[in-house]
Amino acid sequence: MATVNQLVRKPRAPKVDKTNVPALNACPQKRGVCTRVYTTTPKKPNSALRKVARVRLTNGFEVTSYIGGEGHNLQEHSVILIRGGRVKDLPGVRYHTVRGALDCAGVSERRQGRSKYGAKRPKS
């Protein structure tokens, strides 16, 4: 235990917590331009072709963003919105593309969980 005199000389340092999404600069979302849209394979027990995009953000960061949902219309130079949220089986992918915002279309024919994929309510 430090003495009062020691604490006067050198106060206790606050704990600094590390962010999982440094490129967002404490913002909920960020806009960026796709520099490359491609597929990649997940880590060991899983097998698939996951759709991802390399994105140059407005703050200068270049990050990899996962494109969720079935099918997408993204290509190079598409302007997209990204949010935080990692993909556990893709190392280095710490961001998600927001579907239905800017140049990224929502998932067509989506019936359930529509808000997460930018799909409008279907006509009954």
From Swiss-Prot:
A single GO molecular function term of this UniProt record: rRNA binding
UniProt key word Iron: no
Cellular component terms (Gene Ontology): small ribosomal subunit
3-methylthioaspartic acid found at: 89
Record keywords: Methylation, Ribonucleoprotein, Ribosomal protein, RNA-binding, rRNA-binding, tRNA-binding
Superkingdom of the organism of origin: Bacteria
Any GO BP: translation
InterPro entries assigned to the protein according to its UniProt record, in alphabetical order: NA-bd_OB-fold (IPR012340), Ribosomal_uS12 (IPR006032), Ribosomal_uS12_bac (IPR005679)
Annotated Gene3D superfamilies: Nucleic acid-binding proteins
A Pfam family recorded for this sequence: Ribosom_S12_S23
Function: With S4 and S5 plays an important role in translational accuracy. Interacts with and stabilizes bases of the 16S rRNA that are involved in tRNA selection in the A site and with the mRNA backbone. Located at the interface of the 30S and 50S subunits, it traverses the body of the 30S subunit contacting proteins on the other side and probably holding the rRNA structure together. The combined cluster of proteins S8, S12 and S17 appears to hold together the shoulder and platform of the 30S subunit.
Family classification: Belongs to the universal ribosomal protein uS12 family.
UniProt xrefs under NCBIfam families: rpsL_bact (TIGR00981)
PANTHER family on file: 30S RIBOSOMAL PROTEIN S12 FAMILY MEMBER
Complex formation: Part of the 30S ribosomal subunit. Contacts proteins S8 and S17. May interact with IF1 in the 30S initiation complex.
Protein name in the entry: Small ribosomal subunit protein uS12
Organism field: Shewanella woodyi (strain ATCC 51908 / MS32)
Gene giving rise to this polypeptide: rpsL
